[in-house]
Each structure stands twice: as C-alpha cells, then as structure tokens.
From Swiss-Prot:
It comes from the Eukaryota. This is Putative protein tag-278. Pfam families: FAM184. Residues 121-779, 805-1061 form a coiled coil. The lineage of its organism: Eukaryota, Metazoa, Ecdysozoa, Nematoda, Chromadorea. Residues 1082-1095 have a biased composition (Low complexity). The keyword Coiled coil applies. Keywords: Coiled coil. Residues 1-92, 104-129, 974-1130 are annotated as: Disordered.
Length: 1130
C-alpha cells in the first residue's frame, strides 16, 4: 500500500509508489507518522482536468501537472537505486507532493475562474474539500506525532524495566551462589580443623596407651618372672612387638589419608577459582560491549529525533499559513459536521451498551467477593473450633500436672504453645492480608480496564484500516522479538541452573565424604573399647570365681545366719535391677515410637508448606497472566477460592490427625503413670528392706554383747590356737596378697579404660553437637507448630522416668555403701566379701554411667537450650562438697586406723607374749569404729533426705547438675577406695620382706611403713590438685572460646546486613523449574522515575554500584549477530 496522502486511483497511477521493506536499526514502533486516507482526493484530478460548464481549452498548468510533482521521481528518487532508504524520506516526499498538488490546484482554479466565470460554485466546493483534507491531514499528523513519542517513551521504559529485572535476577542469584560457595568452604575448613584435632587427639591417646601398655608390660614381666620361664616371656614380647608394629602401620595409613584429603581439597579450590575468574572476565567484556552499543544507539536516536522535530516544525508553519487562508470557507463545512454528529450519536449508543456490559461484570465480581467473605466467615468458625480444642488440650495438661509432681514443667510447655498459637494467629492474619491485597488488586484491575475502555472510546474515532494493518505487522514483529528474548532468557537460566547443580553436587560429595570418615572413626573406636571391656570382664569373672572359692572356705567356719541374710539382700537387688532394665527397654521402645511420630509430623509440615508455596505462586502467576481481560480475572478468583477451600479441608484433616495422635499419647501417658506407681511400690519395698536392715543391726549389737562375754574364753583359748593361727594367717595372707595384687592391676586397667571411654564419648558429643547445629540450621526454615506439644510432653515423661531410675540407682548405691561399711567391721572374711561387692558395684556403676551418657547424648540431640546455673543450686552444691570433704577426712581417719591394725598385726608376729593385750586394744578400736560407722550412717541418711528434697523441688535442669555433682562425688569415693586397696596390696607385699628382716627392730619397720603411707598420700593429693587445675583451665578455655565466638558473630551481624539464609533445596529446585523461569514475578530493584537507561551518566552510575560478583555466571560465548543487531535487542 502507498503511504502518500494523495489518492491512488485509476487516473494517476504515478502517486501509488510501492516501497521495499527494509530492516532498520531503530526499534520498529507501531505508530511512525503516516497520513491516513481519511478522505481520498479522487475528485481533485477530474475536476481540474474537466471543468463543469463544458469543453474548455487545455491550460498549460494542467499539462504540467502529471509530469511535475505527481511523477514518481520526486516522491521517491532513491527507491529505484537503493533499498536502504528510510520511511522518513518517503513521508517527506508524500508531504511535499500534497503541498505541490494543493498549489497547482489553486493556480488551476484561478485560471479556470478567469476563463469560466459562470461556474464558481463547483470550484469553491472543490477548494473547500481540499482545505478540509489538508486540515485533517495536519491534525492527524500531530496526533500521530504524539502517539509516536508516547510509544517510543513506553518502549524505552519497557527496555529499562527489562534490563533492571535481569540485573536484579542475575545479581541476586550470583550473590547467593557466592555465599553458598563461601559457606561450603568455611564448613569444609571447620570440619578439616575438627578432623585434624581428632586425629591429633587420637595419636596422643595412642602414644599414651602405648606408654601405659609398656609400663603394664614391665610390671607383668616382673610378676611373670616369678611364675614363668624365659621362653614364655620371649613369646609375650614378640606378641607385643607385633601389636606395636600394627599400630604404627595404622598411624602411617591415617597420615597418608590426611595428606590425600588435603590435596583433593586444594585441587577443588583451584578449579573453583579458575572457573570464577574466567566467568568474571567474560561477564565484564559482555557488559562493556552492551554499554557501548547502548550509547551508540542513544546518540543515533537523539539525532533522528532532532531531525524529525525540525521537519515537523517546518511542516506545521506551512500548514498554519494554509489554514489561515482556508478559514474563510469553513461555513460550508457545517453540513458535514451534522453528519459527523449523527455518527457520534450512534457511537455513543454503542458506548452505552459497553457500559451496561461493564456493569454486569462488576456485579459478577461483587458476587465473587461475597463468596470470599462467606469463606472467611467459615474460616473464623473453624478457628474458634480449633481454639476450643486447644482449651481442651490445656485442661488435659492440667489434669496430668495434678497426677504428676512436675507442674512447672508442663506450665512452661503450655506457655511455649501459647506463643506458637500466637505465631499461627499472626500467620492467619498475614493470609487474610494477602486476600485483602488480592481483592484490592482485582479492584485496581477493574479500574484500569474501565480507564482502558474510555481510552479506546476516544481512539475509535482516529483508528483507520491502514493503521490497523501496520499495527498488526509491527505487533507480530514485536512478538517474534519477545519470543527470541524469552528463549535467550530461558537458555541463560538453563546454563545457570546447570552450574548450580554442579556446585551442589560438589558440596554434597564433600559432605558425604566427611560424614563417612567420621562414622568410620566412631565405629573403630567403639569396637576397640568394646573388645577391651569384654576382656576385662572375663578377667574380672575369673577373679570373682577365685574369691568365691576363698569365701566359701572361710564362711564354712563362721556363722550361717549372716550369709543367708546377705544372699537375700543380693537376690532382692538383682530383682530390682531386672525390673529397672525392663522399664528401660520399654522406655527405649516408646522413644523410638515418638521419634517415628516426629518424623511423620515433619513430613506433613513440609507437605503443607510446599502446598502453601505452590498456592502463593499459582495466585501470582494467574494474576499476572490474566491482566488483559476482566473475564479472565474472574476465573482466577474462582480458581483461588477452590484452592483455598481444598487447603482449608486439608488443614481440617490435619487437625483431626493431630487430635488422634494426642489421644494416643494420652493413653501412653496413662500406661507410664501405672508403671510409675509400680516403681513406687518397689521403693516402698526398699523402705521395708531398710527396716529389716535396722533389725539386723540390733541383732548385730546383741551378738557384739555375746562377743564381749566370749572374750574371756578367747583369752584362755588364745594360747592353744596361737600356733595354728600363725600357720593359717601366713597362708591366708599370701593368697590374699596375690589376689589383691591382681585386683589392683585389673582395677587400674578398668579405670584407664573408663577414662578413655569418657574421652571418646566427649569427642563423640562434640561431633554430634556440630551435626546437630547443621541440622538445626536446615530445620529453622520449617515452622514447628504441633511438634512442641507432643515432643515436650514425651520428653517430660521420659525425663521423669530417667530421673526416677537414676534416683533409685543412687539410693541402691548408698545402701550398698552402707552395707559395705557394716561388713568392714566384722572380720577379714567380710573384707573379702566387701571386695566382691566393690567389684559388682563398679560393674553396675560402669553400666549406669554408660546409660547416663547415652541419655545425656539423646537429650543433647533433642534439646538445644542451655541450662543456666542458679545461685541456690550453687549453694547446695557447695554444701554437698563440704559434706564430701568431711567424708574424705573420715576416710583418712579410717586409713590411719587400718594402718594401726596392720602395725598391731606385725607386733603380734614379733611379740607373742603381748598378743592378749593387743587383741583387747583391737576390739576396743573396732567398737570405736562401729560407733563412727553408725554416726556416718545417720549422716548418710540425712544426705539422702536432702537429695530427695532436691529431686522433688528442683526442675529437670537442676536435676542434671545435681546428678553431675553426685557422679563427681562417687568418682572421688572410688579414687579413695582404690587408694585403700593399693595400700592394702603394698602392705601385703611388704609382709614377706618383714619376715626376712626380723632382725630389724619393730620401731624401724613402723617408721618405714608410716613414711610410705605419707608419701602415697602426698602423691594422691598432688594428683588431685593437678586434675582440678587442669579441669579449671579447660573450663576457662571453653568459656573464652565461647565468648570469642559470640563476639565474632555479633561483629559479623553488625558489619553484614541482615540477609536471609542460604536457600533450601526445595527453593533451589523450584527456581530451576521451567514454569518458574517463564514467570515474570522477578524481584526488581526500586528505581526512581527520573532515571534514564539511555543516558551515559546513569549507565556509569550503574557500573559503579554493581558489584564484581554480578557478572559471575553470564554468557561466555559471543553471538555472531551481536555486533550487527541493534542495542535495544540486548
């Protein structure tokens, strides 16, 4: 089609010049200035050539008309030679041709008026029509000019918004990637440091173990020299050498593994750095090229706009002159105006029909909004129902607190739940706000659509067929270019997602390697410790069998009543231990069930969160996709209502499941309460047992009186039995000495292993703490709504059960200690029995300590809160330490008394004449010891009462601290018992030496023995002080490290802005999905309206503000057509 305003009829075909379609560098805008064919000037040429009156002579002007401005050569002279001529030139030629035609028409009208004077009316009408067409063309030129400027500004703003969105996308993703890489690097470095520290500790422990084994080996060689031959010693040495070589090989293998891990880590770091640098350079180059192209394009657009403005000014001046001349003939145009007014009335009727349709649509939207209000009211009713259910749960919790003694715990749990309910209410309010926002958006859309309808009504008058065809053509081109841009964006996002996948795979592989190494180390350490413990247990069982044989020999001579009572006591204790083990097994089973329920709840919460996120994304997509028409927005609202209903039904089902689970937990709580009552019955049986024990003590007192009566008879029989006793005593002392030596060595080994196991458990605890911290960082994203109800109730019940068990164990330990102290008073055979009970107690303590450590580790995994010390608890701890110190002093006094007994035994051997007097002194001392033991029993009962009060009054956090204090006290007592056993072994070993050295006086022997005892006491006190100082130093170091970490965290928070944590795996997968990539809801940076992307000043500002990490994962390959195509397409 021709672009000229001149008519392209059959008489003058030269005007309709076709021009070729040329690809331009500027953006193809849908409204470049082109004169519309409002009224064709077909009548102009005919009237000029043939007048109305009749045949006239042809004028010279009319002969020149077809060869002058109407020819195709002046309109488009370049079209025959070059295809690169712009539309601007064609438009200029069309305007010039219009002006020349008007000038020629006027001259011809003047000439015809001179020649044909009797026909002025037809010429005047023709001239008026020409003037009208010219004025209409001028007005439409001005309109099209404004349209062009508006479309160009809109296009410029769209390009700027696109570029801003793309920059915001890439900058956010690149920053997140860099932060993830840095976080992974820091995690890897921290884990490498912890792994190195563990390796160093493991090597130190190995060296210490080797040194201890060497020392023990030397001791065993000294013992075995008396028993075995040289050949057996050589075989043992060879075995130890082989074991030492094996341990050294393991050490070398661990070092090689450490070096290999360091090399792999360095290689991966180098690769990541090289990739990062290459991508940075490529992104910088691309960014600079794009900036240069945009600047060039900006200059070209400015030049074109200036040229066109000048041309428009010239045209307007010429047209204004013509309009002044043609104002005289406007009166005849009123008839045309009336016709146009009729047309306007018709169009107004059409507009009224459109307004009626709009009102119908508005009524439909109001109905939909009413439906939404009804749904919200239903939601409020369901919320009230949920609140009622919460109140019922609180009542049940209060009933449980009345049944149990832990009211304060459950009240704290209920307060936490109230906080969470408030959080849930806040979430519901947030959802309601979102609904209100959606409603406001729908209203704004209706307003926008109404304004668009008004604009369309104004535009309907000026739209023509040619404009519609050009618009369709240009819109097709714009759609093609948009599709190309979307395909490019999609390709860029795919590349970015591929790189993200690679980095995540590297990170996961590193994680798995570290976790596998840690697990292997744990398994090896556990196996080694279990093997050593089993070996020690076998040796202990052998020794216990030997001791039993000796005790049977001695018990045959003594009374049988005491043995029967002790057997009953042992049976009762064994039954109690069995019941406790059964309760432990049940509790572990219930803990497993609770863990399964927690996992299920976590899965359900994750599902609900995913659904909520999907709902939110779907609503945003639907709102953005259905902005064009109002009918589509109504459909979106209906879909959203259906989705909200489905979500609400899912929440109802989830609440029903919660209520069912809560009922199950209440049934379990009832069963646990019944079991607790059974345990209370067992405790009452124990109290009955204590009453039996008091009866036994009374019987012992009566027997002591009988012993006093028998003293006289014993004095008479001492002379006869002295010879027999010396022989028996010598044999028994030898056997006891050997057994005590063996027991001391085995007890030392057990203590070393116990210390080693504690160290390993501490290391395991640190590793578990690190793993728990990482898991907590992952789990903080998910909202913990229903977990706290179930987890806190179950934890409180399990803790109550564990505390009651520990308390019963401690009561049993105190009772066994009291029985030991009672048995110490009797005879040497009773002392052997005490050794057996000590061995049994140590086994029980080892098992108890292991179970306690397991419980503590589970509690540390489940609970992340740190318990603070109260001043009242510290005061009670100080009081207990004071009581423990008093007990230590009394034990020291007992040691002195035992030393005196040994001295008296030596004096009996050396001085047979003074035995009767010494035996009387010994009986007096024994009575004094009995009185002391009774006083100690009363003190211990007082301590037990205090412990019970503490257990009943304090909370779980205080119980833990008290248990730790009691464990420390038991360890100190065990150390004192070990020292007593060492002294007994030393004294037993020193007996054969004293027999050999009978020539030395008794005074010298006594001095040597006292000096040895003093040296050992000093060594023990020094060891204690060293251990306490080391513990204090370790605690101070830990406190300093914690303070430094907290200070570093605070500094990091102050320096760095509050940014969100690294996105979870679900968010990453959602970002990679193709549906997300096509959506336009990208986070755009807020920018002022005055900012112009085409100006070089603003572009330089953006270059300065942008960080170097923004160009990390941009395209590295250049497009072949990037230099040829214009800058606005980037």
């Amino acid at each position: 089609m021709s672009r000229s305003p001149r008519p392209h009829g059959t008489h003058e075909p030269a005007v309709g010049v076709t021009r070729p379609f040329v690809r331009q560098s500027h953006p193809e805008i849908a409204a470049w200035p082109a004169p519309p064919p409002a009224h064709q000037l077909g009548c102009l040429s005919g009237n000029v050539r043939t007048p109305v009156g009749g045949p006239a002579p042809p004028s010279p002007v009319l002969r020149r008309a077809p060869s002058g401005p109407i020819s195709p050569s002046p309109i488009s002279p370049v079209s025959q030679h070059s295809r690169a001529s712009s539309r601007h030139d064609i438009d200029n030629t069309s305007l010039l041709s219009i002006l020349k035609l008007s000038h020629v028409a006027r001259e011809s009208s003047r000439n015809t008026s001179r020649n044909n004077s009797p026909q002025p009316a037809g010429r005047e009408t023709e001239l008026k029509r020409k003037i009208q067409t010219l004025e209409e063309t001028v007005a439409e030129y001005e309109r099209q000019k404004y349209n062009v400027m508006g479309t160009f500004s809109e296009y410029r703003e769209r390009v700027a918004e696109r570029e801003r969105k793309l920059e915001a996308e890439y900058s956010g993703k690149i920053i997140a990637l860099s932060e993830e890489v840095l976080g992974a690097k820091k995690d890897f470095e921290a884990r490498m440091k912890s792994f190195q520290a563990l390796q160093d500790k493991f090597e130190r422990e190995k060296e210490q173990a080797l040194e201890k084994l060497r020392k023990e080996h030397q001791k065993e060689i000294q013992v075995l020299e008396q028993r075995f031959s040289d050949t057996q010693l050589l075989n043992l040495e060879q075995k130890y050498i082989i074991e030492i070589q094996r341990l050294e090989e393991e050490r070398k293998s661990l070092r090689t593994e450490k070096e290999r891990l360091g090399e792999t880590f360095e290689m991966k770091l180098r690769r990541a750095q090289s990739l990062y640098e290459t991508e940075l350079t490529a992104a910088k180059m691309l960014y600079t090229k794009e900036l240069e192209a945009l600047r060039d394009h900006e200059e070209a657009l400015k030049e074109e706009l200036l040229a066109r403005q000048d041309e428009f000014h010239d045209r307007l001046q010429e047209l204004q002159l013509q309009s002044k001349r043609s104002r005289e003939d406007l009166v005849s145009c009123k008839n045309d105006v009336t016709a146009l007014e009729k047309k306007l009335h018709n169009k107004e009727k059409e507009v009224q029909t459109l307004t009626k349709e709009l009102d119908q649509v508005k009524t439909e939207t109001n109905d939909k909004i009413r439906r939404l209000t009804e749904v919200t009211s239903e939601f409020a009713e369901y919320r009230k129902k949920f609140q009622q259910q919460e109140e019922e749960l609180r009542r049940k919790a209060r009933l449980l607190t009345v049944v149990e003694a832990a009211k304060e715990k459950l009240e704290s749990v209920i307060s936490d739940l109230q906080v969470e309910v408030k959080a849930l209410k806040n979430k519901v309010e947030f959802l309601e706000k979102e609904r209100e926002n959606l409603q406001s958006q729908s209203e704004s859309q209706t307003q926008l659509q109404s304004s668009q309808v008004d604009a369309l009504e104004a535009v309907l008058h000026s739209v023509t067929k040619e404009k519609e065809t050009t618009k369709e053509h240009y819109e097709g081109l714009l759609l093609k270019e948009r599709q190309q841009a979307e395909s490019r964006e999609h390709a860029m996002k795919k590349e970015f997602s591929c790189k993200l996948n690679e980095l995540e795979e590297q990170y996961t592989s590193l994680k798995e390697e570290l976790e596998e190494s840690a697990r292997l180390d744990k398994d090896e350490l556990r196996e080694a410790s279990e093997i050593e413990i089993q070996a020690l247990r076998t040796e202990k069982s052998i020794l216990a069998a030997e001791i039993r044989v000796l005790t049977q020999k001695i018990e045959d001579e003594e009374q049988d009543d005491i043995t029967e009572q002790l057997a009953k006591i042992v049976e009762d204790t064994s039954q109690l231990t069995r019941t406790l083990e059964e309760y432990r097994e049940r509790i572990t089973g219930k803990d497993a069930e609770i863990l399964n329920l927690r996992k299920q709840l976590e899965k359900e919460i994750s599902h609900t969160e995913d659904r909520n996120r999907l709902l939110h994304e779907n609503t945003q997509k639907e709102l953005e996709a259905h902005k064009e028409t109002h009918t589509e927005t109504v459909r979106v609202l209906e879909a959203e209502i259906d989705q909200f209903k489905s979500a609400f039904e899912n929440e109802q089902e989830y609440g029903k499941e919660k209520s069912a689970k809560i009922r199950e937990l209440e049934a379990q709580n009832k069963t646990l309460l019944s079991e607790m009552e059974k345990v209370k019955h067992v405790a009452e049986n124990l109290e009955a047992f204590t009453s039996d024990k008091d009866n036994l003590l009374e019987e012992l007192e009566s027997k002591n009186k009988n012993i006093e009566h028998l003293k006289q008879e014993i004095a008479q029989l001492n002379e006869k039995i002295s010879t027999k006793e010396t022989e028996k005593d010598s044999e028994l002392e030898k056997t006891i000495a050997q057994l005590e030596i063996d027991n001391s060595s085995k007890s030392d080994q057990i203590e070393k292993l116990h210390l080693r196991v504690n160290d390993m458990l501490d290391q395991m605890g640190t590793i578990k703490d690190e793993l728990v911290k990482k898991n907590e960082e992952i789990k903080t994203i998910s909202a913990k709504t229903a977990q706290l109800l179930e987890s806190n109730t179950v934890e409180s019940e399990t803790k109550l059960a564990s505390v009651t068990e520990e308390r019963e164990k401690e009561i049993q330990s105190f009772q066994t200690q009291i029985s030991e102290k009672d048995n110490e008073v009797l005879t040497k055979a009773e002392r052997i029995n005490e050794l057996e009970t000590c061995l049994k107690e140590r086994e029980v303590e080892l098992t108890g300590m292991r179970t306690k450590l397991d419980d503590m580790t589970q509690q540390l995994n489940e609970e992340t809160t740190v318990v603070l010390f109260d001043n009242s608890i510290q005061e009670k701890i100080d009081e207990k330490e004071a009581t423990i110190n008093e007990m230590n002093e009394r034990l020291k006094s007992r040691e002195n008394e035992i030393a005196k007994l040994h001295e008296e035994m030596y004096m009996q051997k050396t001085q047979n004449e003074k035995r009767n007097e010494e035996q009387s002194k010994l009986f007096q001392e024994l009575m004094f010891e009995k009185e002391q033991l009774e006083a100690e029993k009363a003190e211990q009962s007082h301590i037990e009462a205090e412990v019970e009060q503490v257990f009943q009054a304090d909370k779980e956090s205080k119980w833990k601290e008290q248990i730790e204090d009691l464990e420390n006290a038991l360890q100190r007592k065990n150390e004192l018992i070990q020292q007593l056993q060492d002294r007994q072994t030393d004294e037993s070993t020193s007996e054969p030496h004293t027999k050999k050295r009978m020539s030395i006086t008794s005074h010298g022997v006594f001095q040597n023995f006292v000096s040895q005892m003093k040296d050992k006491r000093e060594e023990a006190s020094e060891k204690r002080t060293r251990k306490e100082a080391e513990k204090k130093a370790e605690k101070e170091k830990e406190k300093a490290e914690k303070a430094a970490k907290e200070a570093a965290k605070e500094l990091a928070r102050e320096k760095s802005p509050a940014r969100a944590k690294s996105p979870s795996i679900l968010t990453r997968l959602r970002d990679r999905s193709p549906a997300k990539s096509k959506s336009d809801n990208l986070e755009s940076t807020p920018s002022s309206s005055s900012r112009n992307l085409l100006s070089p000043f603003d572009a330089e500002k953006r270059m300065e503000r942008s960080s170097p990490s923004q160009q990390l994962f941009s395209r590295t390959k250049k497009d072949s057509s990037s230099e040829k195509r214009p800058a606005w397409k980037f």
